[in-house]
């Protein structure tokens, strides 16, 4: 068997985001063939992937992007069948807590039902891939004890947290019931230069830098 035949294949949802772009780089460095699912509306916000997308030795060779939506099971299933990944990293979804109060149905459709759709699809594949779901500390709401762990009760206080709690528990159920290799990673706030500027921590950092440079006088 050649080295090319041994190459692992991974599929990333949410690849245009902070974590997805870093994960794509990591997997490529490890020798993976990396496929990413992007929304049509993400076509103008791929700056985190520009260095990969513009490299002819990477894009189309070891790195591929596919248009699909978590709300569109037909297209999503076609991508899964075509790519036949060994590993799926599910990072996509509506991830803004404040916005989830304004668009709760969309938040639940993408974050909760979208995860369920993926689980249903992969359990029907001849060789179900390993599945990782990026959960969130928002599933715990306002816990009385610090720090939390896997046994901390779910008590979300916003639509995003509720959607993530549903998705997280469905991963557990599908692992126990159908024997899938499916796991959750409970994510807390984490920062990088690639984090979206609409998050409060990025706003604070940018304002602090602007104050230092004399471009503004106070945090905005």
Give the location of each predicted region:
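N-terminal Rossmann-like NAD(P)+-binding domain of SDR-like oxidoreductases, especially those catalyzing
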Residues: 1-190
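Glycine/proline-rich active-site loop of Rossmann-fold NAD(P)-dependent oxidoreductases
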Residues: 165, 190-206, 212-218
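Generic recognition of well-ordered alpha-helical segments
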Residues: 170-173, 203, 207
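Sparse recognition of residues in long alpha-helices and their boundaries
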Residues: 116, 219-220
């Amino acid at each position: 068997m050649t080295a090319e035949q041994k190459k692992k294949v991974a599929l990333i949802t949410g690849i245009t985001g902070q974590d997805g772009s870093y994960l794509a780089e990591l997997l490529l460095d490890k020798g993976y063939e990396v496929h990413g699912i992007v929304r049509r509306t993400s076509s103008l916000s791929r700056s985190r992937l520009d260095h990969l997308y513009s490299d002819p030795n990477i894009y189309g060779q070891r790195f591929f992007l596919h248009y699909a939506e978590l709300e569109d099971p037909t297209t999503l299933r076609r991508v899964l069948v075509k790519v036949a990944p060994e590993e799926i990293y599910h990072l996509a979804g509506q991830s803004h807590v404040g916005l989830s109060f304004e668009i709760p149905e969309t938040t639940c459709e993408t974050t909760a039902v979208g995860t369920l759709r993926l689980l249903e699809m992969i359990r029907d594949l001849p060789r179900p891939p390993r599945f990782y779901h990026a959960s969130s500390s928002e599933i715990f709401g306002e816990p009385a004890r610090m720090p939390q762990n896997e046994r901390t009760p779910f008590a979300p206080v916003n639509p995003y947290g509720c959607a993530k709690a549903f998705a997280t528990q469905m991963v557990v159920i599908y692992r126990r019931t159908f024997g899938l290799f499916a796991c959750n990673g409970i994510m807390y706030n984490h920062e990088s230069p690639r984090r979206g500027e609409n998050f409060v921590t990025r706003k604070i950092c940018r304002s602090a830098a602007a104050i230092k440079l004399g471009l503004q006088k106070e945090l905005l």
